[in-house]
Amino acid sequence: MKQKTFEEIKEELLLRAKKAGACQIGYAMGLRSQSKADILKAITDNWSWVSRTARIVDAEYLEDNFAEEDLAEAGIYTQKYHEVTTTSFACDSATVKAYGSATVKAYGSATVKAYGSATVKAYGSATVKAYGSATVKAYGSATVEAYDSATVEACDSATVKAYDNSYVEDLTGNIRPQSGYAVIKDYYNHKIYIQKGRYQIIEVD
C-alpha cells in the first residue's frame, strides 16, 4: 500500500474531524499542524474524543500512517511491550507497564500494569492490574485487578477484583472484595462491603 503524505493525512483527518463535529480548539490544532508530530499531538490532546467518541482514528489507521518510532515519541502504543513513566496511550494489543506518576489511557484490548502513583483510565475491553497507590477509572467492559492500596472507580459493565487494602467506588453494583481488607463502596445499591478479617465492624451514625 502506498504511504500517504503528511498533507494527505492532514486533509483526511481534518475532513473526518469536521464531519464528526470537532470542537473549535481541537480542529484548529489539526489545521495548524506542520508535521506528523503536530498531528499526533493534536490526536493525543483530544485522545478520548478522537479514538473513542468520534472514532476518527484506530490502531490500524495509526499503524498504517505513522512510523512506530513517531507513535512512541507521542506516547502512543498499539502493540508490543513498553515501560513508561509519562503520559501514554495504549490501544489494540499493546502492553504497558506504568511507574511513578505516569498517566495511561487504555483502549481496545490493551493491557496495563500500574505501579506507584500511576493513573489509568481503562475503556473497552482493556485489562488493568493496579498495585501500590495506583488509581484506575474503569469504563465499558474493562477488567481491573486491584492490589495493595490501589483505588478504583468502576462504571458501566467494568469488572473489578479487589485485594489487599484496595478501595473501589462501584457504580455497577456487581463488585465484591476478594481478600485482604479491600473496601467496596457500592453506589448502585447504597452499600459498603469490607473484607473485615479479624476486625469487628462498628457502625456509627
Locate predicted features.
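Short, glycine-biased loop/turn motifs at secondary-structure junctions and
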Residues: 1-107, 113-115, 121-123, 129-131, ...
